[in-house]
Amino acid sequence: MSHNEKIQDENKLIAERRQKLQKIRDTQKIAFPNDARPTHKAAQLHRDFDHGDEAALSQAGTVAIAGRMMGKRVMGKASFVHVQDGSGEQIQLYVSSDALTEEVYEEFKTWDVGDIIFASGSLFRTKTGELTVQTNAIRLLTKSLRPLPDKFHGLTDQEIRYRQRYVDLMVNAQSRDVFKARSKIISYIRHFFEARDFLEVETPMMHPIPGGAAAKPFITHHNALDMPLYLRIAPELYLKRLVVGGFERVFEINRNFRNEGVSARHNPEFTMLEFYQAYADYNDLMDLSEVLFQGLAQTILGTTKFDYQGTEIDFSQFRRLPMRDAVCQYVPEAANILEDAPKMVQLLKEKFHIDAGNESDCGKLMTMIFEEGVEHLLIQPTFVIEYPAVVSPLSRRNDENPDITDRFELFIGGREIANGFSELNDAEDQAERFKEQAAAFEAGDEEAMHYDGDFVRALEYGLPPTAGQGIGIDRLVMLLTNAPSIRDVLLFPHMRPE
């Protein structure tokens, strides 16, 4: 069947269903009743009675089920229906004219797959052993005007699955499982930090000054105040203000927004966990992260070793690797030129086809080589440490080498999953770094940070020794659900207009 024929066929079915709905309206019946109260979920019935004997089934009494009709077989005066409810499972109904009035049964025969119905009755087991509700009452709750995807071919168009997630969730159990796992992951994280005396907080989503990360912001305008506002790219500067104020352990799970590209790993709107702990350093946070990730894997998957896109990931051990060592190991031709900016610029151009222009800062150039030549090779959990200070404007300098910072990024499966560091709490140093960032912004770097005078003022009151970290929830869910694209773990990912 051609695409046009499919559209014509679907339009014909929609027209037929609209006629059925109009017939219901014409009989002066309530077309969309809202008084059905189910007593059980399909999953609950299967759990409690799949292996029960006849005595157990009879003791169950009357059960009431509500859900979407996913299958229907009419055989004269008797029919079988499969209903799927919010538990994600289906239960079979046996519907016969003997148990219903002739009028009700005739109405039932006109209902379509996709309709939402309510039924009550007693449990029994068919000759094939399937748990079934012998229906003595049945009602139409919501008339579905659009047919579900063909049950044999399903919803195979990936783009339609993203655009019409509501249909995807109806027909794809795997998609439902992903989002149930996502909810479980977030719940575990929340309890993990609460158990360690972290306070969950909420900080602004609209900022007068963009900051907290190197990214291009979304810009909006506040009419009443006649001022520009920026959707937050990170909550970092507000969370550290709270530590200044005396909340020594805080965390937030919320959205960030970055006006950048869309890819298998990037969505303009994404969920981030950020947490800050006073009297801790980046080593403490790496230790804490290992415990968090191992506990998550054990809870969600039942193991710390799991498959991700054909590769076994092992959460039982995490490597710690200085960035310089990583570059030397994975890009050996860079090992002897990391202090020679012109040669690094040449290497970036010849090996990675990256034009670094007139960049002369070796720290920036080494980071560029790392991003192009190393990141995607870090499959097993690896904390890359000792980031150059020039690319870490909010991080504390290393005591022994002020050109690097006490910062790490965690890579798993070739992707950055987390970023953390001992926080810069020297107000004067922070002010100077903000000035450098502001100059870079004025020179055309749209991802450079702005000067945030209020944050500097907060630091002047005194930020205790603190470490902070951000973890990308979406990428973490991708790992733990074996999802190849970030769109697979976002209920409603951003898409181009149809």
Swiss-Prot record:
It is found in: Cytoplasm. Its EC number is 6.1.1.6. It comes from the Bacteria. It holds the Pfam family tRNA_anti-codon. Binds 3 Mg(2+) ions per subunit. One of its GO terms (molecular function) is lysine-tRNA ligase activity. GO terms for cellular component: cytosol. One of its GO terms (biological process) is lysyl-tRNA aminoacylation. InterPro entries: Aa-tRNA-synt_II (IPR004364), aa-tRNA-synth_II (IPR006195), aa-tRNA-synth_II/BPL/LPL (IPR045864), Lys-tRNA-ligase_II (IPR002313), Lys-tRNA-ligase_II_N (IPR044136), Lys-tRNA-synth_II_C (IPR018149), NA-bd_OB-fold (IPR012340), NA-bd_OB_tRNA (IPR004365). Mg(2+) 1 binds at E409, E416. It catalyses: tRNA(Lys) + L-lysine + ATP = L-lysyl-tRNA(Lys) + AMP + diphosphate. Mg(2+) 2 binds at E416. Keywords: Aminoacyl-tRNA synthetase, ATP-binding, Cytoplasm, Ligase, Magnesium, Metal-binding, Nucleotide-binding, Protein biosynthesis. Its cofactor is Mg(2+). Disulfide bonds: none annotated. Gene3D superfamilies: Bira Bifunctional Protein, Domain 2, Nucleic acid-binding proteins. PROSITE patterns: AA_TRNA_LIGASE_II. Its main location: cytoplasm. Homodimer. Belongs to the class-II aminoacyl-tRNA synthetase family. This is Lysine--tRNA ligase.
